[in-house]
Structure formats: structure tokens, C-alpha cells
């Protein structure tokens, strides 16, 4: 949802799906039938970046460059990904990489061509322990990293007694933003809709605030 908020603010944004073999960012964006080329087509010169990156049909400025379904991961090198990122940054204001789950080759390829990292976690011990491991793996790349705490509710804070400050301490990261728990999010995902275009509160408001901070604006951190 962050990429949607950035695009809505007038930025030219590319979503790069790097989950090779398990891509699903096209589903989240409602662009299943739109993405015909993937980033390996650009890497190996089969088409241009302008042709492979598809603009969202309902939100101007939001583009998707998807991952391949079947491909030899060993053929995708760090040098090739860094060259691709140079192309991307010449044409877009932001490139948000959807990093694959786990700490494997896809994770390290994504880290090698990024200039910062955003860790999105829920406010529970298991997720925060995973975040600690990710932070350790990111250190060799020298990437500045920040934390987004997702699905936060006042009820959870009261019952579990674990608040956002606790999450920051456990992950060892500064806070970029807080996203409230919002029942509209799974409904919008199932329908392939852009929640941020429907409302300006709840999770959409949380991500809009994060987008403004990424653009250098000072926005208070809080949730409703």
C-alpha cells in the first residue's frame, strides 16, 4: 500500500517484484492480466524497461515490473541487478522492491541493489525476532533501515502490554511509521482494489503518512 500512497502524492513509482517463482505483487495490485514481461526480460535485453514496466490502469504514476515464474535463480547476478536499478532510478522517483520471504538469494540480491530498507512487522514477539535476524543480514550492505509496525490496535496494546516503543527496542530500529489494524485491507486485497484511493483514514492514512516522511515531510506518528 505504500507504493500506492507515493503514486497518489504525484511521484512516479515502480514496484519491483523480486520473489522469483512465487510472484504475487500483480495480484495485490489488481494487475494480473497486465504484466506480460518480467524483470529478466530487461536484464537480458529481450525488451526495454519502458515496455516491461506496466502502468496501473486506475492510478497514474504507479508501475509494476514483475518477477519471472520459472527461471534459474543462479543466472541473476548482483551486477546485473545493480545495472537494472540504475536504469530504474533514471526513470522513476521511487523503486520499491518487494523482497521475497526468508533470507536467501533473493533477499541478498534485493539488498545489493537497494539504498535503504523498510522492515514491516506486526507487533508480536515472533515477527520482531525475525526482524532482528534481518537487521543482522542487512549490516554488510550498509543500508539504513527503519521499522513500520503494521496492524496496530489500541486493544492489542492494552491487552498484550507491548507497545510500539517495545517493538522499536526489540528490532533495534528507528520507527518510520505505524499502520492501524483495518478490516478494509483484506477486503480490498481480495477485490484487487486500491484502498488508498477509497479512503483517507485507517491503514490508508497510516501509509500516506509514511509516504510523506519518505518524501522528507515531518508528519506526527500516531494512529486512530
What are the residue ranges of the model-derived segments?
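Post-Walker A helix-loop "phosphate-sensing" segment adjacent to the P-loop in P-loop NTPases
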Residues: 5-15
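P-loop/Walker-type NTP enzyme "switch/lid" segment
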Residues: 15-90, 187-196
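Conserved catalytic-core segment of NTP-binding enzymes
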Residues: 83, 87-90, 94-181, 186-187
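Amphipathic alpha-helical transducer elements in NTP-driven molecular machines
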Residues: 36, 50, 78, 82, ...
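Short, small-residue-biased leader/transition segments that mark boundaries at the very start
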Residues: 1-2
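NTP-binding/hydrolysis catalytic cores, primarily Walker-type P-loop NTPases
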Residues: 190-224
Amino acid at each position: 500500500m505504500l507504493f500506492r500512497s507515493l503514486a497518489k502524492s504525484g511521484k512516479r513509482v515502480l514496484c519491483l517484484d523480486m520473489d522469483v517463482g512465487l510472484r504475487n505483487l500483480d495480484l495485490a495490485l489488481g494487475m494480473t492480466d497486465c504484466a506480460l514481461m518480467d524483470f529478466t526480460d530487461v536484464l537480458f535485453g529481450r525488451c526495454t524497461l519502458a515496455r516491461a514496466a506496466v502502468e496501473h490502469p486506475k492510478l497514474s504514476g504507479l508501475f509494476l515490473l514483475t518477477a519471472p515464474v520459472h527461471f534459474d535463480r543462479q543466472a541473476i547476478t548482483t551486477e546485473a541487478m545493480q545495472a537494472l536499478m540504475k536504469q530504474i532510478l533514471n526513470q522513476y522517483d521511487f523503486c520499491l522492491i518487494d523482497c521475497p520471504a526468508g533470507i536467501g538469494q533473493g533477499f541478498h540480491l534485493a539488498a545489493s541493489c537497494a539504498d535503504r530498507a523498510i522492515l514491516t512487522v506486526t507487533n508480536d514477539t515472533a515477527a520482531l525476532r525475525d526482524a532482528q535476524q534481518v537487521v543482522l543480514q542487512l549490516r554488510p550492505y550498509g543500508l539504513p533501515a527503519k521499522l513500520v509496525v503494521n496492524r496496530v490496535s489500541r486493544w492489542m496494546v492494552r491487552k498484550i502490554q507491548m507497545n510500539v516503543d517495545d517493538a522499536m527496542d526489540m528490532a533495534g530500529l528507528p520507527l518510520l511509521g505505524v499502520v492501524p489494524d483495518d478490516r478494509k485491507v483484506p477486503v480490498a486485497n481480495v477485490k484487487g482494489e486500491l484502498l488508498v484511493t477509497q479512503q483517507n483514514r485507517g491503514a490508508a492514512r497510516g501509509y500516506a503518512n509514511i509516504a510523506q516522511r519518505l518524501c522528507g515531510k515531518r508528519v506526527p506518528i500516531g494512529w486512530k
